[in-house]
Curated annotation (Swiss-Prot):
Domain remark from Swiss-Prot or TrEMBL: The C-terminal part of the DNA-binding domain may contribute to DNA recognition specificity.
Effect of P133A: No effect on interaction with DVL2
Effect of substituting P146A: Highly reduces interaction with DVL2
Positions of the UniProt region annotated as Disordered: 1-36, 85-104, 203-260, 359-407, 610-632
Result, substituting L137A: Abolishes interaction with DVL2 and SUDS3 as well as DVL2 nuclear translocation
Outcome, altering K328A: Decreases DNA-binding to 25%
The protein's role, per its UniProt record: Transcriptional regulator involved in different processes such as glucose metabolism, aerobic glycolysis and autophagy. Recognizes and binds the forkhead DNA sequence motif (5'-GTAAACA-3') and can both act as a transcription activator or repressor, depending on the context. Together with FOXK1, acts as a key regulator of metabolic reprogramming towards aerobic glycolysis, a process in which glucose is converted to lactate in the presence of oxygen.
Record carries keyword Transcription: yes
Name recorded for this polypeptide: Forkhead box protein K2
Length: 660
């Protein structure tokens, strides 16, 4: 490598060492003190060409090559040959070491490439097959072996000196130094090449293509018809005329990438380019492999697809060969009724799969309609389901107040007409969660809402995100209503209007006693707030904390119940204690938490069926024996008693405190 670097730095002059140099260059034959006429650069090697012919391939037991490219099976043993033709003119510097039959390597002649490998080679993206005529190489070009990423950069070192020498002898050089000695024939009329000025927002794109910028795709001056003055000097360097490009199919790829055409389009292209507008199956294969290098090295399965398209597509007609025509196999033609349409779409490129041209601004979960109002409780919306959509994020406002002002109109709650499970799509946050479908209708004046939140325990250890739901319980206010809630309820239970509700993690706020219009009834509003983590140290001193696990996802359930007046009237028998009439209400749930009670439908059924009268006990012995008052015991010995007031003056109602 050091020898190659030294030879590279002294290119054009006799190097100090005589090595041809380069990792991967395994051939000799380079005379000491010779001139380097070309350079081959790879990823891990550099080779200086000092003789007339150089072979590139891979070493084997059958022989070695000048430049070895490793052991890839896609590279033949003798894959490429780079040579200079004999009889090139020189510009000085003799090489007496070379035999007289060989031209001087520093003669500065043109370089040619001959492909010897069966897989061919790409020269600047143009495929060169085996057996093709030698290709004249430009001063700098790149070779790439098919089906690999192995590349070689070829650089001619002597051509620069020849151009400088010819340029100094040219008379044009002294007159206009900035013009190269090239003859450019500019026609008098350029109207067919000049297009009108583009509009400020005009786009130039092919059919069914997606422009990548607002200004449009296609900035090539020759393809879109615009010719700038600075582009005139580039026309002389265009080695292939425009008409030749159109004849050979200018849209065909020059590399081995898969063309963006269907098999039917490839068949139409092949048939329309035939002289008599008909081809045999073998002729279609030949046309495709000639114009699209991808199908030369690809699997032969594409040929089966071509045959299937010909036999199944109604636009292709099979024409038998006449007896006078030599050869075998039938011809294929295009249906004349659809020929013009098929030819028009033959070169229309397909859009890549999975890349839509225009994306909708809304995702699959979003909806054009506005989400449900927060005031309409019980209606499942994007806000309560946990799924965030662009619509819900853009229209998210301040939440509705839980306790509206006295002057504000109370919203009408929905009444459940049917309850069923709505299964959402798999993978969504709402999958396998019960959803209550509600229908809105007018409610009587006697129904008053009691709103609270229930935090259900975690029954599984899955990593699903928590689903938040809202609990709304609508009770009919009977003649006897709750007037006080005192003490500490047991873990996972508390009682509202004689019904026990499961709550593993909640703080019971002090009840609010609100007088009704007649002054005889009171209503309690119990608000339960979830606590994410509660330690045992705080349980000893707190008097209104219910213990549960540290992490509990909050779920909400909508429970709405309507009953006519008098259905839930509780037959309360007064109890005389110190001259005060007190009715005690036992709890309906004791012991451990029942996981089934956390289900919304189960809770709905339990709540609807718990309409039996609540028993009470009279301290005098003349009445039939009733179940005793049951107090809920907690770990620290505290209990809770919920007292109900009878239709007596408010002064006769007192609150029963904590029982130890």
């Amino acid at each position: 490598m050091a020898a190659a670097a030294a030879a590279l730095s002294g290119a054009g002059t006799p190097p100090a060492g005589g090595g041809a140099g380069g990792g991967g260059a395994g051939g000799g034959g380079s005379p000491p003190g010779g001139w380097a006429v070309a350079r081959l650069e790879g990823r891990e090697f550099e080779y200086l060409m000092k003789k007339r012919s150089v072979t590139i391939g891979r070493n084997s037991s059958q022989g070695s090559v000048d430049v070895s490219m490793g052991h890839s099976s896609f590279i033949s043993r003798r894959h490429l040959e780079i040579f200079t033709p004999p009889g090139g003119g020189g510009h000085g510097g003799a090489a007496p070491e070379l035999p007289p039959a060989q031209p001087r390597p520093d003669a500065g002649g043109d370089f040619y490439l001959r492909c010897l490998g069966k897989n061919g080679v790409f020269v600047d993206g143009v495929f060169q097959r085996r057996g093709a005529p030698p290709l004249q190489l430009p001063r700098v070009c790149t070779f790439r072996f098919p089906s690999t990423n192995i590349k070689i950069t070829f650089t001619a070192l002597s051509s620069e000196k020849r151009e400088k020498q010819e340029a100094s002898e040219s008379p044009v050089k002294a007159v206009q130094p900035h013009i190269s000695p090239l003859t450019i024939n500019i026609p008098d009329t350029m109207a067919h090449l000049i297009s009108p000025l583009p509009s400020p927002t005009g786009t130039i794109s092919a059919a069914n293509s997606c422009p990548s910028s607002p200004r449009g795709a296609g900035s090539s001056g020759y393809k879109v018809g615009r010719v700038m003055p600075s582009d005139l000097n580039l026309m002389a360097d265009n080695s292939q005329p425009e008409n030749e490009k159109e004849a050979s199919g200018g849209d065909s790829p020059k590399d081995d990438s898969k063309p963006p055409y269907s098999y039917a389009q490839l068949i139409v292209q092949a048939i329309t380019m035939a002289p008599d507008k008909q081809l045999t199956l073998n002729g279609i294969y030949t046309h495709i492999t000639k114009n699209y290098p991808y199908y030369r090295t690809a699997d032969k399965g594409w040929q089966n697809s071509i045959r299937h398209n010909l036999s199944l597509n109604r636009y292709f007609i099979k024409v038998p060969r006449s007896q006078e025509e030599p050869g075998k196999g039938s011809f294929w033609r295009i249906d004349p009724a659809s020929e013009s349409k098929l030819i028009e779409q033959a070169f229309r490129k397909r859009r890549p799969r999975g890349v839509p041209c225009f994306r909708t601004p809304l995702g699959p979960l979003s909806s054009r309609s506005a989400p449900a109002s927060p005031n309409h409780a019980g209606v499942l919306s994007a806000h309560s389901s946990g799924a965030q959509t662009p619509e819900s994020l853009s229209r998210e406002g301040s939440p509705a107040p839980l306790e509206p002002e006295p002057g504000a109109a109370q919203p009408k709650l929905a009444v459940i007409q049917e309850a069923r499970f709505a299964q959402s799509a798999p993978g969504s946050p709402l999958s396998s969660q019960p959803v209550l479908i509600t229908v809105q209708r007018q409610l009587p004046q006697a129904i008053k809402p009691v709103t609270y939140t229930v935090a259900t325990p975690v029954t599984t250890s899955t990593s699903q995100p928590p689903v938040v739901q809202t609990v709304h319980v609508v009770h009919q206010i009977p003649a006897v209503s709750v007037t006080s809630v005192a003490g500490l309820a047991p873990a996972n239970t508390y009682t509202v209007s004689g019904q026990a509700v499961v709550t593993p993690a909640a703080v019971l706020a002090p009840p609010k006693a609100e007088a009704q219009e007649n002054g005889d009834h009171r209503e309690v509003k119990v608000k339960v707030e979830p606590i994410p983590a509660i330690g045992h140290a705080t349980l000893g001193t707190a008097s209104r904390i219910i213990q549960t696990a540290q992490t509990t996802p909050v779920q909400t359930v909508t429970i709405v119940q309507q009953a006519p007046l008098g259905q839930h009237q509780l037959p309360i028998k007064t109890v005389t204690q110190n001259g005060t009439h007190v009715a005690s209400v036992p709890t309906a749930v004791h012991g451990q938490v029942n996981n089934a009670a956390a289900s919304p439908l189960h809770m709905l059924a339990t709540h609807a069926s718990a309409s039996a009268s609540l028993p009470t006990k009279r301290h005098n012995g003349d009445q039939p024996e009733q179940p005793e008052l049951k107090r809920i015991k907690t770990e620290d010995g505290e209990g809770i008693v919920i007292a109900l007031s009878v239709d007596t003056p408010p002064a006769a109602v007192r609150e029963k405190g904590v029982q130890n």
